[in-house]
Amino acid sequence: MPTEYFERRERALLGDRFDALYAAPQETAARGVTVSALRAAPEQFAAQADFPVEPSPFCKAGFVVQDPAFKPGRHPYHHAGVFYSQEPSASSAAPLLGVRPGMRVLDTCAAPGGKSSQLAAALGGQGLLVSNEFVAARAEVLRSNLERMGVPNAVVLNEDTGRIAAALPEFFDRVLVDAPCSGEGMFRKEAVAVTQHCEALVKQCAALGAQILDNAAACLAPGGEMIYSTCTFAPEEDEGQVAAFLQRHPEFTLADVFGNVDYSFGSPGEANRTGGLPLDVNKVRRIWPCQGGEGHFIARLVKAGTPRALPAPGTYTAEEELWLAAAAEQSKKQKGSKGGKPAKAPDARSARRESSRTLREAVQGRSARSRDAGAGEATPAQSLAAWQEFARQYFPALADRPAVVHGGSVLLPVPFPQTGLHVLRAGVFVGSVQKGRFVPEHHLFTAFGALCTNREALTLADPRVTEYLSGREIAADTAADGWCCVTVDGCPMGGGKVSGGRVKNHYPKALRLL
């Protein structure tokens, strides 16, 4: 056992069941991948994958990676957003939320993005996903991962959940709280989880989790549902946390954790872990190491009231139309820009945003110098006209979608109110005018590559896949001259520009295989 405190506590709670429950079936931490429905069906992935996997018991789209030496992050399907590399039991929580297209969904503690990518897949490109992360550097990783997964309808926030609750009360149909925890389910995966573990950390995490839960409850609309999950075994953070929350919030009821799905896994909660408070432990779920995952706890909570009626597929509510109109009006007020955001008086908050923007561009492989040289002096009207001309040629299905100019780049926005929250991304930046020409962004291809009329279609076995992901030019076979989307087995990896039978590589430098 990693720490004396952990073993003493768990032996006292479990008695003679201790050794059996903590006996993992494998020597190293379990590894898995979760397939995104935005890219492929699980059955299609299983048939086409060139590495050994077996279905995960925790999620219909999840698979256990059987080869301990396999590196998912270097696989072309990872780059194409087909799967997210995720510890198997970590994929269990998001599907239990019962997300449907058209809903407004909040992931309160979203980095690095595995559960958000599952929520995005359930939305199917319709509705709104707000993915929040409090730590700035982790929020940038979250943004990058959602772009890689091709999520078109996400707002990425770098905020405190209390500010979100104040700005967006009773706004969301579904909320996921995968709370920061003491990480006892990460002991085998991350050495730091062992070195940092102590009783004081458990108490600190329990207090933070309670605060986040209270804020999340304020964000949830009447009739909405919330999933609370952790990757720890500590009673104060699991059964005890949920029991205490229900005492503070009589407007919530504990629901069967499997009420939205047709499968089950794991074991019921433990009655001696509630801190003496009432809780139907049969409605919550634990995943023990002996069950094939590193460890997880999940509870499903429902808020009293009548759920919001969802808009018809492909439509917006009147309120959402107003938000889009407000974004367009704000765009018109911007002056011609050389890139970046409109200038304003420097203060602590703007400095924080500038620092965040610099890091974001580093992840995208764009420097401040190239940004300033790239966008030129195009006015918002000129930028929009250039985008519409580009879209009519390569993405005709997007040509009539609402578009705005933000910081010199053209954005396909998502309907989201102007709240003053720290937004890293709200929709899809599709490109900007550089030296008089429209140059597309990487996110345009990952989010909408299936709509591109000019594609260089590769198969997984094609050596050009590795060449493209390494940043090299490749021979053009199926794509005509001009901009194209480069795909692997029909899934977009990124963009390129064809000339003379060659595809000039536009895959971001920071993402390339080394």
Predicted regions and their residues:
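S-adenosyl-L-methionine
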Residues: 132-170, 177
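Conserved SAM-binding loop of SAM-dependent methyltransferases across substrates and taxa
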Residues: 112-125
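Conserved class I S-adenosyl-L-methionine
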Residues: 102-111
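Mobile active-site "lid"/loop adjacent to the S-adenosyl-L-methionine
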Residues: 137, 174-214, 227, 231-239, ...
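Helix-to-beta-strand junctions that scaffold the AdoMet/dcAdoMet cofactor pocket
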Residues: 123-124, 220-222
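Polybasic, low-complexity RNA-engagement segments
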Residues: 1-48, 304-514
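Class I SAM-dependent transferase core
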Residues: 58-99, 142, 493, 504-508
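Short beta-strand element of Class I
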Residues: 126-130
